[in-house]
């Protein structure tokens, strides 16, 4: 009995997966992007850009590398192994379970209810 239930459950999951993946409309990447971003990406039929520099974005000086330490000040994130970690912002709220987890728990609970 349990084997047929697992087969039915597997078929239900496969059906849901196929229906969800095929129901999403297929929109090209360029249609999804905003007009400000689309010109920055190459289109599928374009030739390679020339090296005249007209298509490049001018760069600005980068900020200093945080990995290089000159030793003039202690690292504020470093703490000894026996000390408590530094107090920082509160932890992010816990994430909600995904729809798949909720669907699985609903199917299992309803199947166990029907088995009674």
From Swiss-Prot:
Q: Which GO terms describe its cellular component?
A: plasma membrane; side of membrane
Record flagged with keyword Translocase: no
Against InterPro entries, the record matches this protein to: AGP25/26 (IPR039346)
Signal peptide (from-to) = 1-28
Region spans: Disordered: 40-95
Q: What is its main location?
A: membrane
Name the propeptide positions: 90-116
| Superkingdom field | Eukaryota
Keywords, alphabetical: Cell membrane, Glycoprotein, GPI-anchor, Lipoprotein, Membrane, Proteoglycan, Signal
Which stretches are tagged as biased composition: Low complexity?
50-59, 69-82
Q: Where is the lipid attached (GPI-anchor amidated serine)?
A: 89
Which protein family is it in? Belongs to the classical AGP family.
Q: What protein is this chain from?
A: Classical arabinogalactan protein 25
Source organism: Arabidopsis thaliana
User: What is the primary gene name for this protein?
Assistant: AGP25
């Amino acid at each position: 009995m349990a084997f047929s239930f697992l087969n039915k459950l597997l078929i239900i999951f496969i059906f849901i997966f196929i229906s969800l993946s095929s129901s999403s409309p297929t929109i090209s990447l360029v249609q999804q992007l905003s007009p400000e971003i689309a010109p920055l990406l190459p289109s599928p039929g374009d030739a390679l850009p020339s090296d005249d520099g007209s298509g490049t974005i001018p760069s600005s000086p980068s900020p200093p590398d945080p990995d290089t330490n000159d030793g003039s000040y202690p690292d504020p994130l470093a703490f000894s192994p026996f000390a408590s970690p530094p107090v920082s912002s509160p932890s992010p709220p816990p994430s909600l379970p995904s729809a798949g987890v909720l669907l699985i728990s609903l199917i299992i609970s309803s199947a166990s209810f029907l088995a009674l």
